[in-house]
């Protein structure tokens, strides 16, 4: 790698990178990937600034060659690449002359045209994740962030990319070339995997002074210093030590081991109460899409442009009215919010140029729906510790809910095939090893089985919505931004298609911690009449907003079109996981792989081809009251994927607890089926731990009912 860096980069850049590594006490012979990363970052900073000048009229211009005597000033001041002292001197001087706020961390550039510092990032990972890490580290709205990736993606604060398209394309092309060059020398994989997240200030925080003395004083006996204790903890092997202690204790441990027989286990007790309601962040089987095929309009790919184009495909709008009110909400406000969206979209269409983003007017209905000014005022604890009756809020116990049939229907629907493909077959280069060949063959077979699955649509929809909401939450903290809910797919004929499910309006989003909540209002199109299963839609206000003509066996029929509106909320950490929903594909592929591996080890040859191509064979899919359900290998793939996707969509503490505790009972039952004569103690306590997670969550209740079917059939 070191040789490659010296060949690939300008000697001046290499020299600066060597200096930087020396300054931080790093050895470039060992940290070769870091050496390459520093050179790449330096080169991007220089390319960013190259050819950009400000003329005597204060206009930003691009000059690649020309009159050396022209009165031109460099548009960007380069801070990156200078030694720390010099760099801070430059920053201080800029702050003094321009009045800019002094940044906490050294930025990379200063833009004299926009009067702002710029932090440049080059990442081998997802641009969104790296952007968030940068934003979390800098914690300043004044410093502009611009991230490039080696795959040609980029992300910048408020989607303001500073430079013209051509200058940015030069940078992306260079990064792509570096990647290709590395790959051809077999260096890329190691380089890609070596990227660490942004170091937070804590990692480099040396404990000194009083805190250090306190740390040294609070060590367990027999440890002289914090370093000693750390070294001991890092090298501690717990097992032998704990076993020794347990054998000394066994006289005092009073656990009677009871045999676990077929008659021992009882079914789980599911709660009684009103039926459970829908709690996903967006509609699933009930969603309706307004779509455009082969999009080629101006601004294609910009969400707002796409949304307006999709809205224009529908002509059946009518005066909206509430058909299913939200019991606790102010329903006229939801109605007004939808009317406001329609009116503001109409305003945009009347403008000459459609903007890239749309911030909604802060009307009373939106303030109410987004909970503006509703949070109780925070008071410093020191100011109120003398208050005699200081106590936490009384929070009500959650109301118990019973299992409703709709969640099983949702799951069945998620396993079905749609008539569109939601993921592309990844184009990866030629396989160079037999194991790679088998892996890519498995991936291709699996992709073919799940690419049209509705659960895959939910993945892409979830990734899009969470990415868009997280971007808007970082870039437009104070604005009520309108975010279209969009997905993209290909039709059977291979034509591209852009779909609009509805809109989200984001509330204020000053998200400092991972768990800070951003409120949003979702408005989603549907043809489902909410009056058929009102319990499912408890959290929604549903409007009737139009009539849609549908083709049917008897010709065209008109069906009312509904809008499902609700207030909801999410957090940075939930959005981060939402953005990574593609992992569900990987998880289910790994489960299928373990089935293939088991089959292959019995037959002593790779069974991938036979596994996917033998259409006559059926495989167990799951338990139902009727017994073990079986289906084709494709159905198994789609069912496993749907389970993984629902675990993500309905993630909750109840699910975490139920999964962890029910697994223990499952292992005991499996041991009994394998004639291993298992014994248990405190089985009642285990049932209690499982059943305390069965409260009101639809997905957990469905899993518990499946678990009961499994118990019934497993112990016959």
Swiss-Prot record:
It is found in: Host cytoplasm; Host nucleus. A motif (Nuclear localization signal 2 (NLS2)) lies at residues 184-247. Its EC number is 3.1.-.-. GO terms for biological process: cap snatching; DNA-templated transcription; symbiont-mediated suppression of host gene expression; symbiont-mediated suppression of host mRNA transcription via inhibition of RNA polymerase II activity; viral RNA genome replication; viral translational frameshifting. Binds 2 manganese ions per subunit. A motif (Nuclear localization signal 1 (NLS1)) lies at residues 124-139. Phosphorylated on serines and threonines by host kinases, including human casein kinase II. Belongs to the influenza viruses PA family. HAMAP family: INFV_PA. This is Polymerase acidic protein.
